[in-house]
């Protein structure tokens, strides 16, 4: 009987560890909240909080570049360099050239994507560009802002799932 109890406790411990390893602890924000930060919070059932100065290894840092201060941008860059999972929201930055400049400043890569996600996957630092291009069945571009936003949300969730599976 005692052996059976030990097995059940062991199973419960393993399940708890798996659950803990597969969730983000917090979504911390630099700049202001947006629909994208709320999507992250809803998807992973986490609260959104202002950046508190400490980022744990399984936290997500969301940076709204359009509303972040220079000091917040500097903080974001240091977390990108250290390999934290960082969502860089460039949706409020007008124009591809401006987005290129901001992504270059933050990641070292000039990307015109509206959202960029950085982090570590399988030991390598990665930069994911989340594009908002939406096409019809013939690959013709569709100009539909709501469809573009939904596409970005879906791609963002996919990118975060990849970093989350790393178990950081």
Swiss-Prot record:
It comes from the Bacteria. Keywords: Cytolysis, Hemolysis, Transport. The lineage of its organism: Bacteria, Pseudomonadati, Pseudomonadota, Gammaproteobacteria, Vibrionales. This is Cytolysin secretion protein. One of its GO terms (biological process) is killing of cells of another organism. It comes from Vibrio vulnificus (strain CMCP6).
